[in-house]
Amino acid sequence: MTCTDQKSHSQRALGTQTPALQGPQLLNTDPSSEETRPPHVYPDRLCHMEPANHFWHAGDLQAMTSKEFHLAATQDDCRKGRTQEDILVPSSHPELFSSVLPMALEEAARLQQPQPLPPPSGIHLSASRTSAPTLLYSPPPSHSPFGLSSLI
């Protein structure tokens, strides 16, 4: 009798478990729960995607500036009479690379930060408005007659 009692007890346990298992499945297939979930999921994904895209663009810009600087640095080395072998082999001239790397970091920092430091190399009216107008307005009257006479 104990065997049949155990079987009936286990069947009763299974019988009580099957409705419990079907309960959450019915809740998961409830259309109201599905309608409330997607609006919460998609904006979160978009919000997380946008900063990642901005970081990638910033990385691309940094890569471009560093490539441009390295090209300029190798051209400067070639102008000084150094061969490409000296540039490509760091072990032969370690002091050369120790002097070039800090300059590369400083140059990269200058390229990434638009500050009033670059204007001496080029004319930027928006960068320094206090000293630039006086310098730009005084030379043209003196230079304009020479420019016109040279054209005529």
Swiss-Prot record:
It comes from Pan troglodytes (Chimpanzee). The lineage of its organism: Eukaryota, Metazoa, Chordata, Craniata, Vertebrata. It comes from the Eukaryota. It holds the Pfam family SEEK1. Residues 1-31 have a biased composition (Polar residues). Residues 1-39, 132-152 are annotated as: Disordered. This is Psoriasis susceptibility 1 candidate gene 1 protein homolog. InterPro entries: SEEK1 (IPR028206). Coiled coil: none annotated.
